[in-house]
Each structure stands twice: as structure tokens, then as C-alpha cells.
Amino acid sequence: RAFIKQHFYNNCKLYSKGIDDAKKDTSVYQMYWDFSSPLKDVKPHHVLALNRAEREGEISVNLEPDYETTLTMFYDQFNLVNSYYKEAIQDSFERLIAPSVLRELRSDATEHAELHSITVFSTNLKHLLLTPPIKGNRVLGIDPGIRTGTKCAALDETGKFLGYFIINQEHNFEAGKEAVAKAVKEYGIQVIAVGNGTGSSDVCRLVSEAIQEKQLNVQFTIVDEDGASVYSASEIAREEFPELDLTIRGAISIGRRLQDPLAELVKIDPKSIGVGLYQHDVNQKNLTEKLDEVVESVVNNVGVNINTASHALLKYVSGINSLLAKKIVKYRDEKGKIVSREELKNIPGLGDKTFEQCAGFLKIPESENPLDNTWVHPENYALASELYPLIKEQKEITKAMKDQLKNKYGVGETTIEDIILELKKPNRDPRDELPKPLLQTGVLVFEDLKEGMIVTGKVKNVVDFGAFVDIGIKETALVHISEISDTFVKNPLDVIKVGE
């Protein structure tokens, strides 16, 4: 059986054919209407697309192996003394073994494609969550709309909601410009974040003209609003802004995504963020587990300010679950700001084991002990205190000194090196080393584009066949895998990432 399966995999072809020719010209699966490829060469995204098209009754999919060659090779494995044995082998092969093996090959192809899809999604999500924040700026978040108007929400430097207004660019474009200019001056806005949904191009033009005509000292950028509507209707949003309409919550979310993408995006189910590849066609349990792992990894890599983090962010910190995260927020609300890592032990439910797991990831800028605002774990404070004077005075820390510290504190060299790095560059944020969002004062439309023009953009999504890039117009540009580099690219994720 294993021999047959391997031979089928190496030699059989996959064919798909449209079921209703009348739908061919309008079907989204048009390319699969008469599709064929060796099974081993079918790309993962093609497998998932074929499965979906077959499930929706648009096409039929078949695997066609070379039965005769396989049978001949199979006969050679046996000493056939008469035709009876040959007929028995042929019958069992065609009626039992071959159909079973073909089903297994389809299942294997699907499993591999799903695993690949989950890997692509998790990689894209990681890079999206690591998008650098625009810190210390007052932001005007704009959620474009047509029928009910465009919602605008002003936020202070910390993301606190200041006020909102609504403009209708369809019916009163000039009044919209006046409203934006007034808000910029009234709230001291420094950056404008425009959601990329329906009506985005008109709103960008309105903002651009307002900046130029009113001589406003601000810039704007386009923010991916995938999942903003999901957040707006969520329990988290209702708890944060119970008195606000959900459309205003959406504008707040867009603005906060620019100020601190990680803190805002963790409030949304990762599957709603829109950086996947056929994510609805894969095993949802496996997908959820993998995406949660990615979010937890990024949150712990960046670190969390214990006094400003939401319940949604805290629950991803190592050792902290949703229930404990709510207890931390409740403690903070009742007692005021937490002033030391040692105080964490006073929170109900946060025992010694949990403290050991989470303390190094929770930062406290308000603490009198500067180490409470670093990656250094409390169990290594004594070691850090010995190293700090040496680093401050820029003295060389020799191997002999490190060996002495290792023996004294029972730690490895990696721990010592990590502490030295943190003390040299306290409060380092891994996101600071990545490309910042593109800020602009003018706007492009599709008609402005000319062949040969060089434009800058931000990668929104990376898939097997290329990358989707936001270049500041309504339409998202596709950079095909063949155009990504001057050299051969096997996997776009090897050379390009979401957020770049």
C-alpha cells in the first residue's frame, strides 16, 4: 500500500472541470474550470481553492493515476502462477486499494495546505502586531462612510477619547474640510488616521485639501480597518465606551491602531484582522491555537505597561489568563496605579508561581525602582544592581567577572548578557527597529498612476503568489511573486513582510 501511495503521488495528475458552463464567465473559480497539474506540483493555495470550489458545487475534482504502469510494477512484486492471482490482484487494486489511496492523497494534500495556510497567517499576524506605534501624538481617527456619514474621533497622546464629529463628504465636501480643520486646531491634532474602507479615497482627498488649503501642520496616513467593526460591536468596546454609538467606537479603534497597533489589535479576534490565506477553510481549532500562540509571543516580546494595559492585552502575558487580567484591572481601578512589581503579589489570584512567570513582562514606569520598568526579572535584581555601576561608568566587564557572577548567583552567561543589554538600552522596544507608517500630506488616485512610476506603499498581506500593498489609493496593489525581486523567489515571506 505504501508503495502504491508513493507511486501515485509521484505520477498521478489532478484534474478539475466546471460543472455548469453557463457560469464559467462569471465564476470566481474560472481558472479552475479546466485545470490540470501533477499532484505533487499543486500549490497549497490552489488546493484550498479547489476544495472550496468543489464544496460549493462549481467544479468536480479528480485524481487520475497511471493505473497500468502501477499494476505492472505491482505484478512484478509477486510470483504469479496463473491468471486467477492476477485477476485477484487487479480487482483488489482497482476496487479497494486505489480508491482508498486516492482519498488519502487528497486528504494529505488538504492537510498540508491547511498547515501552510495557518503558517502564512501566523507569520503575517506577527509582523502586523509588531507594527511600530506612533507615540506621543494626538490623533484624529476617521472611519469613512457614505450612507451614514464619516465618523471622526479625537484622541489624546495616550489614546483617551476627547470628542467626535461627523462629516458627509458626499453632500458637503467643503463643510467637511472646515470640520477637519476646526478639530485639528481645537484638539491639537498632530496626525490623522484614515480607515481604508469604503469611501476612503474621497476622505483622503478631503483631508489632503484641508491640510493644504488651511495650512494645517499635520500629516495623515491610511490605516487598515479590518476588524474595526468587529471591535465596535464587541463586549470590550461596550465596556470602554458604553455611551457611544458603535460607529464612533470604530473611529476610535482606527486612531488607536496608529498610536499603538498591538494594544488595539489584541482586542479583536485575530481571524477578523484579514491577513490570512483561506483562513475560513482550515481547521479552526488549530488556527485559533496557533494565532493565540503568536499573539502571546509578541505581547511578551514587546512587554506591557501594567498601569495602562487593557484586560484584552494583559490576558496574553505569560502566566495571566482572562480571569486574572480582569482582577488586575479591578485592583488598579480600586487602588490606583500599581507602583512596584512587589505590589503585584497583593492582587487576588496572583500567587508566587504566576508572579515568577509574568513579572518580567510587566513594566511599571511609576516605580521608584528603575528595574521595575525593564525586562530584568525581580529574581535577578541583585545581579543587575552589581552590573549597573559598571555599565554606568562604561567599565569593561571581563570574562572573569562574568564567571564570578555566574557562580555567585547561579545563572547562565545568556542571562548575564541579556541583563547587560537591557541596562545599556533600557526600555528597548523591538518595534522601534521596524519601518514606521507612511505619513503624507497629499493624495493619489488611480488615474494619477502612470506606467514606470515609482510609488511607496505598505505591505498589507503576503500570500503564496505575491504581496498586496497599500499605495495610498482605493485599490490595493498586487506585487506578483515574479516581480518582488530580480532573483528567483520561492516564498514571498522570505523577502517581504506585512507592515514593511
Question: Which functions belong to the PLM regions below?
Answer:
Residues 64, 77, 128-132, 158, ...:
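Conserved, well-folded catalytic cores of nucleic-acid-processing
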Residues 122, 174-177, 181, 200-208, ...:
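Amphipathic alpha-helical transducer elements in NTP-driven molecular machines
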Residues 61, 143, 192, 258, ...:
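Residue-level signature of catalytic and energy-coupling elements of molecular machines
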Residues 4-10, 142-146, 198-202, 223-230, ...:
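A glycine-rich phosphate-binding loop feature that marks nucleotide/adenosyl-phosphate handling sites
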Residues 1-141, 145-243:
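Duplex nucleic acid-engaging cores and interfaces of nucleic-acid transaction enzymes
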Residues 35-36, 57, 73-93, 97, ...:
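Low-complexity, acidic/Ser/Thr- and charged residue-rich accessory regions of DNA metabolism proteins
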